[in-house]
Curated annotation (Swiss-Prot):
Component of the mitochondrial large ribosomal subunit. Mature mitochondrial ribosomes consist of a small (37S) and a large (54S) subunit. The 37S subunit contains at least 33 different proteins and 1 molecule of RNA (15S). The 54S subunit contains at least 45 different proteins and 1 molecule of RNA (21S). Residues 17-29, 227-238, 249-259 have a biased composition (Low complexity). Residues 260-272 have a biased composition (Polar residues). This is Large ribosomal subunit protein uL29m.
Length: 272
């Protein structure tokens, strides 16, 4: 207890050591640091540029929605009040508007599953090979229109949370997509056939692909015309000969008047 009472505290030792100068440490004089604006102001050179921004709207941001830097008063302008839905005027729409074609039924948002399932099978490539270009063009846009109707019905069903008709719509969409796939297949076949025909025409001397004259000039055209003329002359000669042969018996059957004897000569002639 006596030793502890005579031992100085750590705080007292610190004060003693700071108050008594150490013989090993040199004596230096330090100036007091001030945090006032006058002492902390940076030195300004004559050639230094002024980077001060004089914009009155500095700090306002439309992205961060910081708003204006001062309050604005709009008490002098009356603010608009929302109108209840039941008091809004009725909007007149065109009954024959083209956007109605996106709905299968104008009275119902989505048809029932039995009505959605009423559709035929898809067209096959064999059936479409016999169709013209115009028919394939019309059928393609009919399929595109049907797919737009299906997409509109699916969006309305998901928005309303009806929960029915998804499987039927998927089957209907698959049938339409299969038809469009067959149309593409047929058009690809026709394109390949056209390419092969162009390659053959480039080597054919009777075909001219320059576009400066007739596209097809057969080499045996003159031969056919000469043969037809020769056949026509032969037929005309044969017809003339037949007419002459038919005229000869008629000429022999009618005797001339000079060769017929008179009645007196016939009586004078003695009978044997």
């Amino acid at each position: 207890m006596a030793a502890a009472a005579m031992r100085p505290s750590m705080g007292a030792l610190g004060r003693i050591s700071s108050s008594t100068p150490s013989p090993l440490r040199p004596l230096t004089q330090t100036a007091s640091l001030s945090t006032t604006a006058a002492l902390l102001k940076r030195h300004k050179y004559r050639e230094a540029r002024v980077y001060r921004d004089n914009s009155k709207h500095r700090g306002e941001s439309a992205i961060h929605r910081s708003g204006t830097r001062w309050r604005l008063s709009m008490s002098d302008e009356p603010l608009p009040r929302p109108v209840p839905r039941n008091k809004l005027p009725a909007i007149e729409t065109d009954p024959d508007h083209g956007l109605w074609e996106f709905f299968q039924n104008r009275t119902m948002v989505v048809n029932s599953p039995p009505e959605i399932a009423k559709h035929g099978r898809s067209w096959t490539a064999e059936e479409l090979r016999h169709k013209s270009w115009d028919d394939l063009h019309r059928l393609w846009w009919v399929c595109a229109k049907e797919r737009n109707r299906i997409a509109t019905a699916n969006w309305e069903r998901n928005k309303s949370g009806l929960g029915f008709g998804e499987a039927e719509m998927r089957e209907r969409d698959n049938a339409v997509r299969q038809t469009m796939r067959s149309i593409k297949h047929v058009l690809t076949e026709r394109f390949y056939t056209w390419e092969d025909a162009v390659k053959v025409a480039e080597k054919d001397p009777e075909v001219d692909l320059t576009g400066n004259g007739p596209a097809f000039t057969p080499s045996n055209f003159l031969e056919d015309s000469d043969a037809a003329a020769t056949e026509g002359e032969q037929q005309a000669a044969e017809a003339t000969e037949e007419a002459v042969e038919k005229a000869e018996p008629a000429t022999a059957a009618t005797p001339e008047s000079a060769t017929i004897p008179s009645s007196q000569q016939q009586t004078d002639t003695p009978r044997l």
